[in-house]
Each structure stands twice: as C-alpha cells, then as structure tokens.
Amino acid sequence: MEKKETKSESEKTNKQDNKNTKSQKKENLNLVNSDKKIAELENEISNLKDLYLRKQAEFENFRKRLEKEKDNFVKFANETIMKDVVNFLDNLERAINSSKKSKDFDNLLTGISMIENEILSIFDKKYNLKKFGENGENFDPSRHEAISIEEKEGLKNPEIVEVYQKGYCYNDRILRTAKVKVAQSKN
C-alpha cells in the first residue's frame, strides 16, 4: 500500500510540477510580452518627444520669421509715400535753383503753387489725405479750432473769416484741426 500511496503522491507531485511549469511558462510569456510592450511604449514616447521638439523648433522658427516680416513691414510701410515725397523735393529743388538764376518772384510763386497743388492732388488721390479750412466755410468745432471770434450782422451760422493754419484729415480722421478766426451773429 505504501507503493500505491507513493505512486499517487508522485503523480500528484508531477501534476503539481506540471501546473507550476505551465504557470511559470505563462508568467514568463507575460513578462516577455510586458517587456516588449514596455519597449514599444518607450520607443513611442521617444518618437513623440522627438516630434514634439521638432514641432516646437518649427513653431519658434515660424514665430521669428513672422516677427521679422512684421518688422520689415513696419520699416518699409511708408516706402511708397517716401518715393512721392522725393519727387516733390526734386520739384522744390528745381524751383529753388530756377529762382537763383532769375529774380522773377512771380514765376517762383507760380512754380511753388504748382508744386503744392501737385502734392495735394497726389496725397488726395493716392492716400486720401485732404486739406480743409477755407474762408466762408461754416464753423465746425470738430474740424476747426477757433483762435479768435468776431461779431458780424446777419449770420445764421458761425463761419470762418480767416484761416491761420489749414487742417488735414486722413481717411476721414482728423490729423490736425484748422486754426481759424470765426465770425458769429451779434445775438
């Protein structure tokens, strides 16, 4: 009977060993799979870090490029108007040189008036810069600054009788009010 018990115990031990071996193999397989998964995840993390750093560098380069473009835009925004100003300066220089040769001040005055009209015309057409403040205009406190006031008979509305300095507006925004003398009714 002892042999039977030993045999039975031996079979149990073998079965137990087989179970343990299977369990160990499963565990080892799980560990190998886990190690593979960890390696894959670490590789993915590394790739994502690289991608993040590249995108961050690209964004920084884009930001710097945008800043440089903005600086250049601001720097050269007035280039077109400066080209026009240079042409006006050329015309003024010609008028000055002409006046040195000839003492005809009437022609000089005519030439300078032509230059002023050319400047105003180009600024009006190209840049929407307009001059205002003429004798006889109705006084408008948002566009005119009254430097002095005189009383006058028979006026319905205050009007400009003398202009000390012209006003200018750019795209309908007042750059400078006209400085004027205003006449108003005695009432």
From Swiss-Prot:
The UniProt record lists the keyword Endoplasmic reticulum: no
State the PROSITE patterns in the record.
Answer: GRPE
Q: Keyword annotations for this protein?
A: Chaperone, Cytoplasm, Stress response
Q: Which GO terms describe its molecular function?
A: adenyl-nucleotide exchange factor activity; protein homodimerization activity; protein-folding chaperone binding; unfolded protein binding
Location in the cell reads: Cytoplasm
Q: Which family does it belong to?
A: Belongs to the GrpE family.
Q: What is this protein called?
A: Protein GrpE
Its encoding gene is what?
grpE
